[in-house]
């Protein structure tokens, strides 16, 4: 992907998936400019993106509206001290993706601590980034480093595993959740047992009865 630098995102690719918003930080770091539709794909109601915009603005990004699209530009991204009023996973990830390409250090206070943030940090570090504190509410990203490609195996999805877990309990029968991240599923496993499920947590996954 070394040559990828598309500044104008296709509308259908953006409006169909909420997480497309994370392209904002990544492409600003790569291209310096992005034009994109407002993200969609979420059926739980209107979800604002102000946390993302305010955080990136502190890093030197300018935002305007152009024909209903969001236009972002940054002559030079720079590090900043950013305090998130709520621990948004998406905003934390967007800041990290922009910060690894920015000049100087970025400090996030009130960062999200979910496994998804830790996994992103792990991948970026494998690519040469310097990131400290992922998994806590304070993350420091040392920008300006040269990044390179890398192979990285992400952890299995705890939400998908939990969905199958409770589907099994509701429908009955036996299910083996291969590679389920049990270490990230403490509360769902406890609730499943309270509902009458019989669980066996093993290294290779979770057996559900």
What is each PLM-predicted segment?
Residues 1-209:
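Short, structured segments at the rim of ligand-binding sites
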């Amino acid at each position: 992907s070394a040559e990828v630098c598309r500044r104008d995102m296709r509308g259908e690719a953006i409006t169909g998936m909420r997480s497309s918003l994370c392209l904002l930080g990544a492409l600003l770091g790569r291209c310096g400019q992005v034009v994109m539709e407002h993200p969609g794909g979420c059926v739980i109601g209107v979800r604002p993106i102000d946390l993302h915009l305010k955080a990136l603005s502190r890093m030197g990004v300018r935002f305007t509206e152009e024909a209903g699209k969001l236009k972002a530009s940054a002559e030079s991204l720079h590090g900043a001290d950013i305090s998130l009023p709520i621990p948004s996973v998406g905003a934390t990830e967007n800041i990290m993706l922009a910060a690894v390409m920015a000049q100087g250090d970025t400090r996030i206070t009130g960062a999200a601590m979910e496994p998804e943030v830790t996994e992103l940090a792990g991948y970026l570090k494998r690519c040469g980034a310097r990131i400290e504190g992922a998994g806590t509410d304070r993350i420091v990203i040392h920008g300006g480093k040269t990044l390179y490609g890398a192979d990285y195996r992400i952890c299995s999805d705890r939400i998908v595993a939990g969905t199958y877990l409770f589907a099994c309990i509701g429908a009955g029968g036996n299910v083996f959740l291969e590679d389920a991240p049990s270490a990230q599923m403490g509360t769902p496993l406890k609730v499943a047992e309270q509902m009458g499920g019989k669980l066996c947590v093993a290294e290779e996954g979770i057996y559900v009865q």
